From Swiss-Prot:
Keywords: Chloroplast, mRNA processing, Plastid, RNA-binding, tRNA processing. It comes from Phalaenopsis japonica. The gene is matK. Its main location: plastid. GO terms for molecular function: RNA binding. GO terms for biological process: mRNA processing; RNA splicing; tRNA processing. Usually encoded in the trnK tRNA gene intron. Probably assists in splicing its own and other chloroplast group II introns. Belongs to the intron maturase 2 family. MatK subfamily. The keyword Zinc does not apply. This is Maturase K. GO terms for cellular component: chloroplast. HAMAP family: MatK. It is found in: Plastid, Chloroplast.
């Protein structure tokens, strides 16, 4: 409650306070920001590893934060204080856990400050322009009805990976358009320097390895900021170099330094950029992105999609100063191509429909073809993810999870059921349900092998003693609830439940196992 009240007071500051100061650098020394960053960062650690493996709890973490704040108040450099900070009873060696913990806490606190500043500027800009705020926490499954409605009428699709900048200094230059405070810029470069050293020389200790695998809040913010800069091409094209008069594009106004980019592009690309714009007019073009993967679809010709591809390449090379290979952007014809997006293999299938028509004494058949979007869960990627997480072999054979044998039976069963439930819910939009049944089979027998190993027994003896119902009731909880819903509303569709694609409206992120693939 104390942290929430303090953060609420920050958000209630007047707008003039945010604009008068160059940046919120004095807030960097406040403890509650680091505590908030600790709460968001370490409580969302990888779901199948115990928190005790890192070697700290909430009390000790607050002690580390306070020691860090004390050193910063004493105006000691973060790097120079590594060798002479043993006065508090612990070492800050460069390969120690405390050193990397300090580095992460600095970056997380700095990321919280960035979010507060940029979100306040964005909200104030939307209120001044009377633009309604959009809901950011929209379910991922809501994208598939959009794709099903749009892609079935389009001809070509291009899937691309938004390139990541080669050097972190590019991200510093992007943020310096907004951050005018010199101290904050130096601290930003220091964080990048520490991150580079951490990736170059990661110790073999398991605690630091788990800490380094955590996706930091600060770098997620930088990645999103960079992606919005890459999407600047769409804003520039919608109004043909007009200065953002459309409401739909106004939401990106405060995320990118728009006017500076326009002037810079005119100098770099001269007048070739203006000559291409009239050729790229296409009202049937659609763009969908999740994280670094984007889909660009159009009803135009292959020549138009090829122009868009080279336009992307030229834009990234001229603005972000790095070379991007054009062959990494694939252009395929939709009826003959399947693309990977959001953990699914999606393709447009031709669905034949035969209708018999009779006029007077003559009857004839009308054969029509309709396009339908088909989504399939990638079984090879899922098994590969389970194999990397040590739930099965590469071929999909269940194995025991020895790291969980020190837990109680209820905790082991709860973890397996939670993983199975998350995978089943996320991939419920797959048209082939036997893939989900295979994943459930692997997790079910992995759970049985783990419990049998804990009790020093075989799987057969364990199942005979407790019965197969012991695992079936837990792993079939979602299917039973769905059966009750469909039975109550439309009972005649119950026999088709195993073929129906079901979407959930509360999924705002991909499951953790899909990140391994």
């Amino acid at each position: 409650m104390y942290l929430n009240s303090r953060i609420t007071r920050i958000f209630r500051l007047k707008k003039e306070r945010f604009w008068q100061q160059n940046f919120l650098y004095p807030l960097l020394l406040q403890e509650y920001l680091y505590s908030l960053a600790h709460y968001h960062s370490f409580n969302s650690l990888i779901f199948y590893e115990p928190v005790e493996i890192i070697g700290y709890d909430n009390k000790s973490s607050l002690v580390l934060v306070k020691r860090l704040i004390t050193q910063m108040y004493q105006q000691k450099s973060f790097i120079s204080s590594v060798n002479d900070s043993n006065q508090n009873g612990f070492s800050l060696h460069k390969n120690s856990f405390s050193y990397h913990f300090y580095s992460q806490m600095v970056s997380e606190g700095f990321g919280v400050i960035l979010e507060i500043s940029f979100s306040s500027r964005l909200v104030s800009s939307l209120e001044e322009k009377r633009i309604p705020k959009s809901q950011n926490l929209r379910s991922i499954h809501s994208i598939f009805p959009f794709l099903e409605d749009k892609l079935s009428h389009l001809n070509y699709v291009s899937d691309l990976l938004i390139p990541y900048p080669i050097h972190l200094g590019i991200l510093v230059q992007i943020l310096q358009c907004w951050i005018k405070d010199v101290s904050s810029s130096h601290l930003l470069r220091l964080i990048f320097h520490e991150y580079h050293n951490l990736n170059r020389d990661i110790p073999s200790k398991k605690s630091i390895y788990v800490l380094s695998k955590e996706r930091r809040r600060f770098f997620w913010f930088l990645h999103n900021f960079y992606v919005y800069g890459c999407e600047y091409i769409f804003l520039y094209r919608r109004k043909q170099s007009s200065y953002l008069r459309s409401i739909s594009s106004g939401v990106f106004l405060e995320r990118t330094h728009f006017y500076g980019k326009i002037g810079y592009l005119r100098v770099v690309s001269c007048y070739s950029f203006q000559r291409i714009l009239w050729f790229l007019k296409d009202i049937f073009i659609h763009y969908v992105r999740y994280q670094g993967k984007a889909i660009l679809a159009s009803k135009g010709t292959f020549f138009l999609m090829n122009k868009w591809k080279f336009h992307f390449v030229n834009f990234w090379q001229s603005y972000f100063h790095f070379w991007f290979q054009p062959y990494r952007i694939h252009i395929k014809q939709l009826p003959n191509y399947s693309f990977s997006f959001l953990g699914y293999f999606s393709s447009v299938l031709k669905n034949p429909l035969v209708v018999r028509n009779q006029m007077l004494e003559n009857s004839f058949l009308i054969n029509t073809l309709t396009n339908k979007l088909d989504t399939i869960a990638p079984v090879i990627f899922l098994i590969g993810s389970l194999s990397k997480a040590q739930f099965c072999t590469v071929l999909g054979h269940p194995i025991s999870k020895p790291i969980w044998t020190n837990l109680s039976d209820s905790d082991i069963l709860d973890r397996f059921c939670r993983i199975c439930r998350n995978l089943s819910r996320y991939h419920s939009g797959s048209s082939k349900k036997h893939i989900l049944y295979r994943i459930k089979y692997i997790l079910r027998f992995t759970c049985a092998r783990t419990l049998a190993r804990k009790h020093k027994s075989t799987v057969r003896m364990f199942m005979l003693r407790l019965g197969s119902v012991f695992l079936e009731e837990s792993f079939l909880e979602d299917e039973q609830s769905l059966s009750l819903i469909f039975l109550h509303n439309i009972p005649f569709l119950l026999h088709r439940l195993h073929r129906e694609r079901i979407g959930y409206l509360d999924i705002i992120r991909m499951n953790d196992l899909m990140d391994h693939s």
